[in-house]
Amino acid sequence: FRGRDAAAKASGLVGLTDRRGCCSHPACNVDHPEICG
């Protein structure tokens, strides 16, 4: 499950509390499609 592994790594970098903020920024959203879906 590479997608899930990528999501785990992304959430580690971005932080679960920052996910919504990341997804509101186009650059971060593009870098983390697995968490912004």
From Swiss-Prot:
Presence of the UniProt keyword Disulfide bond in the record: yes
Compartment annotation: Secreted
UniProt xrefs under PROSITE patterns: ALPHA_CONOTOXIN (PS60014)
Keyword hit for Ion transport: no
Disulfide bond sites: 22-28, 23-36
Region of interest (Ser-Xaa-Pro motif, crucial for potent interaction with nAChR), ranges: 24-26
Molecular-function annotations in GO: acetylcholine receptor inhibitor activity; ion channel regulator activity; toxin activity
Family the entry assigns: Belongs to the conotoxin A superfamily.
Protein name: Alpha-conotoxin LvIA
Originating organism: Conus lividus (Livid cone)
